[in-house]
Amino acid sequence: MPLKHLLILLFIAVAHGSAFPFTKLVLNDSVPPILMASLRMGLVLLILIPFWKFKIPEKKYMPSLIAFSISMGVMVYVFMTLALYYSSIISPVIVGSQLAIPFGILASAFILNENISPKKWFFIFSAFIGVLIIFFDPKLVDNFLGLFFASLMALAFAFAQVFSRQLRDLDISLTNAFTGLFGFVILLILSFLIEGDTISTIQSISRNSWILISYQAIVVSLGAHLLMFYLYKFYTVGQIFPSYSLFPIFGIALSFLIFGEV
């Protein structure tokens, strides 16, 4: 892999890692989790409209595009915010999200028929055992619901990466604009029905929270994910996805600096 692609993977890891503590900061500022995920996707959509120009892809891409938009734009972000909302500490959620790697490799094998080597099978088994051990940590008694949502986020993210591989021939701005559209509309409706008082809550969001939400929309959802799409034009899911294991290093380090977590 050339140095340029390795640097891209490093940027993606840093961006994904930073998303967790920054999301927790916004949630601590009394922004409801589902609404926050919706606003993040709304900003993604708003930024991409000039590049998307409301183009509709060929019908053969629509099933995978819809599946990707729902799994990534709706499920990943809502489960991520709910995981952090129901967790008093961030680090276990970050580690639990690592289930996305074995989930992704398994999904790529069953859906895309990618080969799983014996080494990858060992890695998959080790990953599940490692997360299972974390679940039995006595310090996490009050965080099981958060870890449950983190596991759902990991599963959704894994399927999203597989679907994105099927969309590699589409324009990246189109794919991510659809993701923003589905995520914004569906999550906004869910927020209105479940969390309520949506308009007044949006009006009361602080400037600092808007900055953090914008960071996640621009740097993480656009920057990191667009670059991930770029790499999928050259590599398989099995080749790229293991690098996802790097982001906990940055996420846990930031959690320590911001919240003092050990």
Predicted feature locations:
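Hydrophobic transmembrane alpha-helices of multi-pass small-molecule transport proteins
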Residues: 48, 107, 119-136, 155, ...
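Specific transmembrane alpha-helical segments of multi-pass solute transporters/efflux pumps
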Residues: 18-20, 49-97, 133, 217-235
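Hydrophobic alpha-helical transmembrane segments of multi-pass integral membrane proteins
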Residues: 4-8, 34-50, 67, 123-126, ...
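Glycine-/small-residue-enriched transmembrane alpha-helix faces in small-molecule transporters
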Residues: 1-35, 139-166, 185, 189
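Helix-helix packing/entry segments at the starts of transmembrane helices
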Residues: 39, 77, 92-99, 163-185, ...
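Specific alpha-helical transmembrane segments that line the substrate/conduction pathway
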Residues: 35-43, 72, 81-115, 153, ...
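Hydrophobic/small/kink-forming positions within alpha-helical transmembrane segments
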Residues: 14-17, 21, 70-74, 78, ...
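Membrane-interface helix termini and inter-helical loops of multi-pass transporters
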Residues: 21-30, 82-86, 132-145, 194-213, ...
